[in-house]
Regions:
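Active-site and adjacent substrate-binding regions of carbohydrate-active enzymes
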Residues: 1-175
Length: 175
């Protein structure tokens, strides 16, 4: 266990024990593709990080949890992304000509930030590896609404926990 975390198969294998503890809701911290250990700097919201398993593993986990009367709630990290997320990469490549420019809060060009430095764009916790999204942008809102609906339909998850809800736009959550 060098990576300091388990995986979806491990949760499936221990569901009976978890149920015997009286737990009826499992809250999953981010499990989407990311290069960090904490996974809050997501680069692909439609792919389970391979270190945790596959979409089929998540589907099986939800099915097995439901058989035991348990629910699965996933972490909705919709306030910020990783720098390697497609929209932010496009901005880094095309600068002011990027069609995703309004997806983030860019203060000036060229973008300047290595991990650990305070960047010239808004980000979560002043950490350049997690650029902050503009949730007032209808395209961003649609993207993340589609993400939320996808996982509900694809794997039958029961709900979402909204990460950084206090920093997210009320406009976004109302819609």
């Amino acid at each position: 266990m060098d990576d300091l975390h388990g995986d979806l198969r491990g949760i499936i294998e221990h569901l009976d024990h978890v149920q015997n503890l009286g737990i009826d809701v499992l809250y999953m911290t981010p499990i989407f593709k990311s290069y960090s250990s904490h996974k809050y700097d997501i680069i692909d919201y439609y792919q389970i990080d391979p270190s945790f398993g596959t979409t089929e593993d998540l589907r099986e986990l939800v099915q097995e949890a439901h058989k035991r009367g348990m629910k699965i709630v996933m972490d909705a990290v919709f306030n910020h992304t990783g720098r390697e997320f497609f929209a932010f990469e496009d901005i880094m490549e095309k600068g002011e000509k990027s069609k995703y420019l309004d997806w983030y809060y860019i203060e000036k060009f060229p973008l300047e930030s290595e991990r650990g430095e305070i960047p010239n764009y808004k980000c979560f916790g002043y950490y350049g590896g997690m650029p902050k999204l503009n949730l007032k942008n209808p395209e961003v809102e649609k993207f993340f609404t589609d993400v939320a609906c996808y996982w509900i339909k694809e794997c039958d998850i029961d709900g979402w926990r909204m990460d950084v809800g206090d920093e997210s736009s009320h406009y976004f959550w109302k819609n």
